[in-house]
């Protein structure tokens, strides 16, 4: 990514520079300071396909932010953290300006906390929706009955191109490298078939305090429930998290299987709406709030 324009100390002594893998232990410490659940392994996985900016003061990491470039027209931004001791000093604004450098022709997506929303609005982001974070000890969910011609089955590694195409259609941006990494590392990936053609999929992955279900791509809410119920059953009696779209229609059902709502970050976009084809699959649950 371009060198930050603030690579000389500002009046407060803060220097922005490209983030490297050597920063990850310190970045994890920053997120832990805010009580975010990310493990060191979660940081490593998210950084693998990212570009990052680190903010230092007196040789100490005080802020981070990552961006992911998808194709030629899209990007996501996440894991924007400023240590509480340095908040209120416009470090977040300088960090975001550096992350947005060179993205003027891209549609940029992020999920905002209530604390960060005002900053993102000042930088040109607009609210497009909301994510509902549900989590808890998953209860065995009744399996969702599928109509004739529909079935669930395990995904094979040779199906990567089909899963990448489904994800791109549902998310509105091509994320081939991310889907490839997730398929390799997921504890389970289940595919929803209709007439022997894949029309949806979902993954169960180690993340944070336990496991996370996501992404979940399906043609409709019943298909999404079938995928989620299967994976929640695999992880029954264990901590499970899922981040769903506000309009998914799944919130009440998720609470019935023990996954209660705990947060509701705002979905924001800069540079125009995401183009999701009508009649195609929908993204019912995101990967993480950082990467979308």
Question: What residues fall within each predicted segment?
Answer:
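Intrinsically disordered, low-complexity, positively biased terminal segments
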Residues: 1-13, 20-25, 45, 56-57, ...
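Surface-exposed beta-loop interaction hotspot
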Residues: 128, 133-160, 167
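Short Pro/Gly-enriched beta-strand edge/turn motifs at strand-loop
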Residues: 34-39, 172-175
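N-terminal, Lys/Arg-enriched amphipathic/low-complexity engagement segments
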Residues: 38-42, 46, 66
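Conserved catalytic-core motifs of GNAT/GCN5-like acyltransferases
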Residues: 107-111, 126-140, 261-273
């Amino acid at each position: 990514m371009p060198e930050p324009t603030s690579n000389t100390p500002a009046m407060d002594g803060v220097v922005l520079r490209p983030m490297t893998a050597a920063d990850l232990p310190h970045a994890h410490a920053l997120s832990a300071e805010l009580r975010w659940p990310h493990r060191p392994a979660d940081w490593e996985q998210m950084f693998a396909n990212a570009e990052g900016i680190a903010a230092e003061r007196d040789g100490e990491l005080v802020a981070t932010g990552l961006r992911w470039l998808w194709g030629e027209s899209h990007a996501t931004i996440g894991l924007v953290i400023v240590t509480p001791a340095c908040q209120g000093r416009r470090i977040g604004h300088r960090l975001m300006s550096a992350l947005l450098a060179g993205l003027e022709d891209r549609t940029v997506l992020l999920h905002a906390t209530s604390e960060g929303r005002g900053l993102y609005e000042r930088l040109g982001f607009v609210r497009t929706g909301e994510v509902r974070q549900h989590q808890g000890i998953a209860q065995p969910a009744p399996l969702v009955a599928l109509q004739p011609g529909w079935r669930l089955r395990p995904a094979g590694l040779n199906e990567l191109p089909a899963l990448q195409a489904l994800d791109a259609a549902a998310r509105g941006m091509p994320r081939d490298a991310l889907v490839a990494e997730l398929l390799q590392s997921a504890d389970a990936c289940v595919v929803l078939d209709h007439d022997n053609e894949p029309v949806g999929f979902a993954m169960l992955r180690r993340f944070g305090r336990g496991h996370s279900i996501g992404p979940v791509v399906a043609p409709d809410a019943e298909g999404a429930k079938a995928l989620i119920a299967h994976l929640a059953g695999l992880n029954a009696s264990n901590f499970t998290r899922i981040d769903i779209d506000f309009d998914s229609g799944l919130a009440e059902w998720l609470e019935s299987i023990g996954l209660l709502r705990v947060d509701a970050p705002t979905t924001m976009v800069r540079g125009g709406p995401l183009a999701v084809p009508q009649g195609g699959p929908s993204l019912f649950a995101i990967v993480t709030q950082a990467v979308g």
